[in-house]
Design a protein with these regions (language model features):
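Exposed, interaction-prone regions of secreted/extracellular proteins
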Residues: 1-93
Length: 93
C-alpha cells in the first residue's frame, strides 16, 4: 500500500520566469517553526481501524530552490513535515 500527501503550484512561465506564487507560508522548511508551514502528528488508519505512524516516509521535490519539504519525528510532534517556499527568488529565476 502507498499513501501520498502533496502540494502543487502551477508554473506556466508566461513571462519566461518562474511564478512568484508561494507554497504554504512562503518560507522554506529549514526556517522551521514559526516561519515554515507544517503538518504534525501524521498518522494512518490500519485495516483494524487503529491509528499508526506511517513507515518508510520519503520526499520528492522537483525544484527545491523554489519549494521544498523536510520530514522528521519526535516525541511531541510524532511524524511531521515542513513544506513551502517563496516561488521566484534569486536562486529560482
Amino acid at each position: 500500500s502507498m499513501i501520498e500527501w502533496g502540494g502543487e503550484v502551477v508554473n506556466s512561465e508566461p513571462d519566461g520566469k518562474h511564478t512568484s506564487t508561494q507554497m504554504g507560508s512562503g518560507h522554506f522548511p529549514e526556517e522551521g517553526f514559526g516561519k515554515a508551514s507544517y503538518f504534525r502528528n501524521v498518522q494512518v488508519v490500519d485495516s483494524s481501524n487503529n491509528l499508526k505512524a506511517p513507515k518508510g516516509l520519503g520526499t520528492f521535490t522537483e525544484q527545491s530552490n523554489c519549494y521544498d519539504v523536510q520530514t522528521g519525528s519526535n516525541g511531541d510532534w510524532g511524524h511531521y513535515f515542513y513544506f513551502g517556499g517563496p516561488g521566484r527568488n534569486p536562486n529560482c529565476p
